[in-house]
UniProtKB/Swiss-Prot annotation:
Belongs to the RRF family. The keyword Cytoplasm applies. This is Ribosome-recycling factor. It is found in: Cytoplasm. InterPro entries: Ribosome_recyc_fac, Ribosome_recyc_fac_dom, RRF_sf.
Length: 185
């Protein structure tokens, strides 16, 4: 039973780190990336629809994103949704495609983005620690029920702590790399 708790905790910690990585992909680091539009929802025939389902998104140059809607009538709605998402981007619409030029990041904007990265990192660490707490609680319940011994409890608790430390170090490393990428001029 204790092994199952360890395995389950490990899987949940892995998912927390993966979610953090996906979240960081939406933080732009001066280069154009289609992932900045992942959370943009377009009001398409009354239903909120992700922009990636309505258009082909390409990156022809390092600082340019081109959005080519499958349905030309939705081009205005896509442009409005991008502006409403408040990503600091200014789309330009020529009737067939939307172009988004990514401006070079200012020093102040870079520092703001680093703060966002640190905030996301802290949220990911909290998620990992919550998994640790839940795992430890489950182990204590097993020990109270007599399914594992006190020594097993101590051993499994140490194992969960080692996993927690490993995943928190992974979050720190990902954050450090993203900060370095953002601060690159």
């Amino acid at each position: 039973m204790g092994q199952q708790v360890l395995k389950f905790s490990n899987e949940k910690m892995e998912k927390a780190v993966a979610a953090y990585s996906r979240e960081l992909a939406t933080v732009r680091a001066g280069r154009a990336s289609a992932s900045v539009l992942d959370k943009v929802q377009v009001d398409y025939y009354g239903a909120p629809t992700p922009v990636v389902q309505l258009a082909n998104i390409t990156v022809p140059e390092a600082r340019l994103l081109v959005i080519q809607p499958y349905d030309k009538t939705s081009i205005g709605d896509i442009e409005k949704a991008i502006l409403k998402a408040d990503l600091g981007l200014n789309p330009s619409n020529d009737g067939t495609v939307i172009r988004i030029a990514f401006p070079a990041l200012t020093e102040e904007r870079r520092r703001d983005l680093v703060k966002v990265v640190k905030k996301y990192a802290e949220e990911a660490k909290v998620a990992v620690r919550n998994v640790r707490r839940d795992g430890n609680d489950d182990l204590k319940k097993l020990e109270k029920a007599g399914e594992i011994t006190e020594d097993d409890l101590r051993g499994y608790t140490e194992d969960i702590q080692k996993e927690t430390d490993k995943y928190i170090a992974k979050v720190d490393e990902i954050a450090k790399n993203k900060e370095k990428e953002i601060m690159e001029v």
